[in-house]
């Protein structure tokens, strides 16, 4: 009898210990969906019948215990520190160079025209000829379009862009060869020869400017002398009119002197083909003095004119040599 009591007491202690551990792992006891416990059964019997094994494996709880475990995990996940939220916000993605905005209808048309032009150029290069008739050229330009007017439009675009050269009824498909041939016909000066002629031109230009200055001084001296003669003539006629003679005598004299001046001006015009004026008289006398100085100094005016056209073709020519 005593052995039975000791066995029951040890079983009771073991059941009490494991029930305490299971109470910590569960928030509430699960309600058994089976037959309700008998009120007459003793607590020792229930604990003995429902006690757990000493080394029971971890079994996933079912029913309400599973829901409670999931709820506990959810609460623990909400309360934990989220390191991903502490990270700085991601930098905005920069638009890559390969990204293109929306293409408009005009852009599509432009791309189509460019592609058509490239196809026509490749087709023209495949011909292998330098010159083709204009009709064949238009036909090739319109091969990639159903519209017959498109060929004329593409042909005009190629002509304006300089890809071909249209000369009448012929079309040059290789304009670079034509331009190189034309450039070969244009004479060019070598750099060394050009430097030598420029230096020679500068020396001749200095001499020419000195001749022009000397001729201008001589002409102005003549003009001042002419002014003195006119003033002396006016003073002499004034004295003869009011002191020596009378107006009746001086009137025909003044008339004939004036007629002489008119005839001299007319003769000047016939000889120089210039207007008989002070400016015309100055230019005529300047050219005369200039030619005289050029001859006296043995200045090569023809060489100077040639070099002037070579190095200063846009120089405006004056009345002087």
From Swiss-Prot:
Membrane-traversing stretches: 223-243, 249-269
Span of the annotated motif Selectivity filter: 247-255
Gene Ontology biological-process annotations: calcium ion import; cellular response to hypoxia; mitochondrial calcium ion homeostasis
Pfam families xrefs: MCU
Gene name of the record: MCU6
Functional description taken from the UniProt entry: Chloroplastic membrane calcium uniporter that mediates calcium uptake into chloroplast stroma. Constitutes a pore-forming and calcium-conducting subunit. Chloroplastic calcium homeostasis plays key roles in cellular physiology. Promotes calcium uptake into chloroplast stroma in response to osmotic-stress, fine-tuning cytosolic MAPK3/MAPK6 phosphorylation and affecting stomata opening.
Protein's membrane topology: Multi-pass membrane protein
Subcellular location: Plastid, Chloroplast membrane
InterPro entries according to UniProt: MCU_C, MCU_fam
Superkingdom of the source species: Eukaryota
UniProt family annotation: Belongs to the MCU (TC 1.A.77) family.
GO molecular function: calcium channel activity; metal ion binding; uniporter activity
Organism from which the protein derives: Arabidopsis thaliana (Mouse-ear cress)
Major site of localization recorded for this protein: plastid
Catalysed reactions listed for this entry: Ca(2+)(in) = Ca(2+)(out)
Statement: the UniProt record of this protein carries the keyword Transit peptide: yes
One GO cellular component term noted in the UniProt record for this chain: mitochondrion
Transit peptide range per the UniProt entry: 1-56
Disulfide bonds: none
Keywords assigned: Calcium, Calcium channel, Calcium transport, Chloroplast, Ion channel, Ion transport, Membrane, Metal-binding, Plastid, Transit peptide, Transmembrane, Transmembrane helix, Transport
Protein name (record): Chloroplastic calcium uniporter protein
Annotated Ca(2+) binding sites: 251
Gene inactivation effect: Plants are drought resistant and recover quickly following rewatering.
